[in-house]
Structures are given as C-alpha cells and as structure tokens.
Amino acid sequence: MFNIQSSIKKCLPDVLAVLLFVVLAFAYFFPADIEGRILYRHDASAGRGAGQEGIEYLERTGERTRWTNALFCGMPTYQMAPSYHSTNVLAQAANAYHLWLPENVWYVFAYLLGFYILLRAFDFRQQLAALGSIIWAFSTYFLIIIAAGHIWKVWALAYLPPLIAGIVLAFRGKYLWGLLLTAVFTAFEINANHVQMTYDYLFVIFFLILAWLVDAIRKHELARFGKAVAVCAVGAAIGVCINLSNLYHTWQYSQESMRGKSELVKENSENQTNSGLERDYITQWSYGIGETWTLMIPNAKGGASMPLSLNETAMAKANPDYTSIYQQLGQYWGEQPGTSGPVYVGAFVVMLFILGLFIVKGPVKWALLAATILSIMLSWGKNFMGLTDFFIDYVPMYAKFRTVASILVIAEFTIPLLAMLALRELFTVYSSSSCDPAVASGKAERKDYTKGSEGLAGKSPVNRQL
C-alpha cells in the first residue's frame, strides 16, 4: 500500500501538468470550443475540396478509393489522405496520446505535452518542464500553421520533441524507455506524413549524437555510446517498419512528380538540380538576413502580409483621410513573397539562450548552438546561395523540399531548449546560495537543489554536466 501511495505521490505533479496543458489548450481555442465557431484554415479547406470525391466514395461504399479525378486529370489519393490498414492501430494509439481531445485543441495539447516529455527526459523538475513547454508551444509559428491549415506539419512538429526525448533517455543509459519512446514517436512522426519537418529535425539529432560522440571519445566511453546508438537505431527501425507502406508509396510517387528526376534538362541551366526541385522554386520563400531579427522582435519587418488598414495600433495614429491608401499598403516589407506572420521565439527566451552559451556546460550546448546557426543560415536561401547551393547539390534529399524558411523550426526548438537549460542553471545557483551559506560565500562547491542535474548532468557517461 505504501508503494502505491508513494508512486501516486511521485506521479501527481506530472498528472497535474498534463491537466494544465488540457486547460491551456481549451482556453486558447475558447471561442471555437464554447461558442461553436469554426476556424477557417485555407489549406485545410482546399484539401477538403480536393478530396471531396474520395470522401463521397467512402460514405457511399464504405471503402477508400486510391484514385481521384479531381486533380491533375487524375492522381493517386495516397498522398492526399494516406490511410493504410497497417497503421490503423497506430492512429488509435495517437488518439489516445492526444486524450481524444477535439480538433485544434489537441494540436496545442500535443505541442505542450511533447516538449514536456523532452524536458523531463533531461531530468527537469515538473514545474520548470511545464514552463518550458508553454514557452515552446506558444511560439508564433506553431500557431500560425494551425490557422493556415498546415495540419500535417503541426502533427509532425508535435511528435518531434518526444522522439528526441527517447534518444536523450537512451544516451542517459535508460535503454528501455529510450527504445520505447524512440519507436513509438518515430512511428507517430512518419505517420504524420510531413517528410520535410522530419528531415529538418534530423540535423538536430545529427548534431546531438555528434556532440555525444566527441564527449564519449574524450572520456573513453565508446562502448556505452555504441549501446545507446544501437538502442536508438532499433527504435527508429521499428517506427519505420510500421510505416513502410506509406514510405514506399511516398517514394514511388515522388519519382513521377516534380521532385523526381526531370526528363527534359536545359543545357547550362544553373536553375536545374540533379534530382529534385528547381533552385528558384526551392528558395522562393527565403527568410531575409535582416528578417532574422524577428526571432526576438516580432514586427521587425512589419508582421504579417495584410493591409495596413487592418492594423488597429497603426490606424489609431493614422490620418483617417488616407484610409483608402492604407488599404492598399501591406504592412510586411520583408524579402518573402508573403507571410502569415513572423517567426518569433521571444526576446527574453533569446536572452536566456545567449546566457546559456556561457553558463551551461557540456556537449549538448554546442549541438544546440550548431543546429541553431545552421538553421538560420539555411533559412536565408537565395540570400545566402553559397551554402544553399552546397546543400542542394551535395546533401541527400535537400533538393526535394521547398520553402527553405521553414527550417527555422530548428531554431524555434533549440533556442527554447538551451534557454531552459540556462534557466535551470540559474535556479541551481540561486537554490544553492540560499540553502548553503558556504556556497554563497564561495567556500564550498555548489550542489544542485533543483533535481535537474542528475541524469544527463550527473551520472550519465555521455554528458556529465549540461
């Protein structure tokens, strides 16, 4: 009985955090939840229209059609609405993970819960983990893509933090949990069917594993490193195998699309790629170099592409005689053709990230810094063509994806993560000085009173101090 009570008491803060996330998710979509309003999402509406023929067929026959005449004089439906018998159980498991919450609500809930799992894998206390989850989930881009209807992208981004949590646990020596989380969330991630987001986050995973490898070499702990890599590889393989049907048909379809090899090649054309999209198309949505300031100043380039007349703050100071002119002026003046809003992480979060570069110890910091810098430079696209051309020509699959600005999702992940590591370090120092006068006077080594530094920061052979 004592053990049961002890377990309940131990899990209670995590349960309360999950309940908090449910409340926050419902609160954010309060009008839609309570008043019955519908969030108009352009891409989702367009997708519904394109798939209407298949929906009617399903309602009429009870079976899914694998072909539609509604697009391009006919095309397979498995890239419009992928559904395979082999992943039916996976879909049910994902619904359980979302607690069967309503649409829109579970998107935000999955954001919050996913990053919470990641921070708990880094051995954060529940309160700090919940705070970090809120900071990450309410980054502007993640909410903008919900409004735009980029739902598969939402799913993919929500599953990536817990996927990385599985890798972190494996490198902490918790192999069973690492295997389980890596397998489950790799399966969820691939089933989300947004290959570009998955591909982008492979850079984060690459830098983390590289940093841990260097650390393992320095400390002569390659055996433990190899075991962790093997666990992650097995988990990833399980997730991939569950989705083999989807992956195979995606690959097969890509060969016949504009992402495949072109049959007609212009001679001496610098715009062509060996196998993939054309350079102009890849870099059409490139973040401006100066536009990078939006990570901490949201309206550095004016905000979203909308008429200035809709900006209530600006109109409060404007001359009403020129309203017709304001209706024709867009408030966004950046380098992209248009945008629904800036990629904003938060000035305070960026400050903590910079502070973390100085006060956080260990290899994870360098991995997060490298991934951040790379994602920012790649997001510049046509404004930094030297690096972009190199990746298009030499990095496998990079030429398959467009809208290079979207790779800033990496920075939106790494900046809050390092910021939270820095915040934990600050709380550690504060708690140590408050609890131990010897530490405050500098006469003793500080201890960690935040219960955040055990695990990766403590006994892990790969990363003893973050």
Where would I find each of the regions flagged by the language model?
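Transmembrane alpha-helices and membrane-interface helical segments
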Residues: 113, 117, 162-169, 205-215, ...
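Alpha-helical transmembrane signal-anchor/signal-peptide segments
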Residues: 34-47, 250-266
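Membrane-embedded helix bundles of polyisoprenyl
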Residues: 114-121, 127-216, 228-250
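Hydrophobic alpha-helical membrane-interfacial segments at the cytosolic entry of transmembrane helices
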Residues: 14-22, 224-251, 266-270, 374, ...
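Membrane-interface coil-to-helix junctions
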Residues: 24-118, 134-157, 273, 277-345, ...
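Start-transfer (signal-anchor) and selected internal transmembrane alpha helices
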Residues: 1-30, 227-236, 351-354, 364
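Perimembrane helix-loop-helix junctions
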Residues: 1, 201-239, 250, 423-433, ...
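Membrane-interface helix-loop-helix junctions at transmembrane boundaries of multi-pass membrane enzymes
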Residues: 10-12, 217-230, 313-327, 352-382, ...
